[in-house]
Amino acid sequence: MLATLGVPFDPEAVAFALGSAVELGQRLIVANFVERAPLPLSAMLGYEDLPDPPELARSIAEPARLAHSLGVSVTRLRVKSFHPIPAMLEVVAEQDAGLFVFGPDRSRIMRLRYRRAVRAIRSTVTALVWVAD
């Protein structure tokens, strides 16, 4: 599983996750966890699911496209939550991932948020963990 928190992926994380999925012959889950509060008026008007910015959309789509071209089964997830870090941990547990690659581009994510996520991942996730450092 390759995951980010609403920012583009780190290229090293993509390479590691993709290489591992190809080598192991396992499905690759590409997941983006975003902090979005569902607003009642937005939901009524049909605007609750705004698309990702183009750069982020390309960053999320590229690993999936590459994996698919290499014959790897791919699942793409976009999870919106008030609390994206706990949501990410819940999805990792539900999917029973053997390898979890947390790969947001460090230059695009707030330092405190990244540290919080890494601390939660290391204390909760039972799979092998790769973190972009």
Show the residue positions of the predicted features.
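Short beta-strand elements of ligand-binding domains
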Residues: 31, 102-104, 129-133
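A short acidic, amphipathic alpha-helical/loop segment
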Residues: 15-17, 87-91, 116-117
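Small/aliphatic-rich secondary-structure junction motif
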Residues: 1-45, 124, 132
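A short acidic, glycine-rich active-site loop
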Residues: 47-59
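Short, hinge-like loop/turn segments at secondary-structure boundaries
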Residues: 45-49, 93-95, 118-120
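Structural beta-alpha unit
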Residues: 68-100
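Glycine-rich, Arg-bearing micro-motifs that act as flexible, cationic patches
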Residues: 99-123
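Residue-level detector of structured alpha->beta connecting loops
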Residues: 25, 71, 96, 125-126
